[in-house]
């Protein structure tokens, strides 16, 4: 998108989906969502998103969703890393959040010899610890959802660990590069041959929506499996 002075921001794309692209009502585009829900979509942040944007405090619902998303992603990535063998439990032993979760698992179940079950219960305990901490640390007088200082530190250490040992692992980077190539191939093909796009997208182009925006919207809605299959389809035409 850079050559066309465009960029992809998942918050903005979420807004486009719920306000413009979804067509389930006869008299207007988008979904019938409240202002608070749409505001939450735009204010959802990660350390990599919207670096130059500064928002007023999001609604409580949006704050809860934002931190719940972080809990889910971090712990799911730990589970993925362990399942794939790219990280090990021994590596995680230095993380206080893993130590605390392991201790609780031992207190509850004793020694678990099955590593698959032990991993599942420990990741589940990490999720439980973070959720319980959010509940206890959120101060209604400040109207703010947050971790306590201790678990905020644990969470940062967990994210740093994932960045150092999982996100930039050679196998993960190779998969990421492959995904980028698939997206680039799709974009280039559609841009050169718009007739390869679905008929509804071709219709959008005919009504004046820029081709690059239509392609962006279409690719953004693809699953990994569909994107791979679609590249195979259009390159064989």
Language model segments and positions:
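Short helix/strand-bridging catalytic loops that position acidic/His residues to coordinate divalent metals
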Residues: 1-5
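Histidine-centered, transition-metal-coordinating active-site segments
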Residues: 7, 11-13, 17-237
């Amino acid at each position: 998108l850079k050559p066309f002075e465009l960029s992809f921001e998942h918050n903005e794309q979420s807004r486009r989906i719920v306000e413009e692209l979804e067509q389930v009502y006869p008299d207007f585009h988008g979904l019938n969502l409240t202002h608070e829900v749409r505001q939450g979509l735009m204010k959802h942040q990660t350390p990599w998103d919207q670096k130059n944007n500064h928002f007023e405090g999001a609604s409580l619902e949006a704050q809860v969703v934002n931190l719940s998303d972080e809990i889910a992603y971090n712990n799911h990535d730990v589970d993925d890393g362990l399942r794939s063998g790219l990280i090990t439990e021994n590596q995680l032993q230095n993380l206080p959040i893993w130590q605390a979760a392991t201790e609780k698992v031992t207190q509850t179940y004793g020694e678990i010899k099955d590593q698959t079950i032990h991993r599942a219960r420990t990741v589940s305990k990490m999720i439980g610890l973070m959720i319980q901490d959010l509940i206890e640390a959120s101060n209604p007088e400040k109207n703010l959802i947050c971790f306590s200082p201790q678990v905020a530190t644990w969470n940062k250490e967990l994210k740093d660990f994932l960045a150092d040992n999982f996100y930039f692992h050679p196998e993960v980077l190779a998969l990421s590069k492959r995904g980028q190539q698939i997206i680039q191939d799709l974009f280039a093909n559609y841009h050169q041959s718009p007739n390869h796009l679905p008929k509804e997208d071709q219709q959008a182009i005919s009504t004046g929506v820029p081709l690059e925006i239509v392609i962006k919207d279409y690719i953004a809605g693809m699953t990994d499996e569909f994107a791979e299959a679609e590249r195979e389809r259009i390159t064989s035409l």
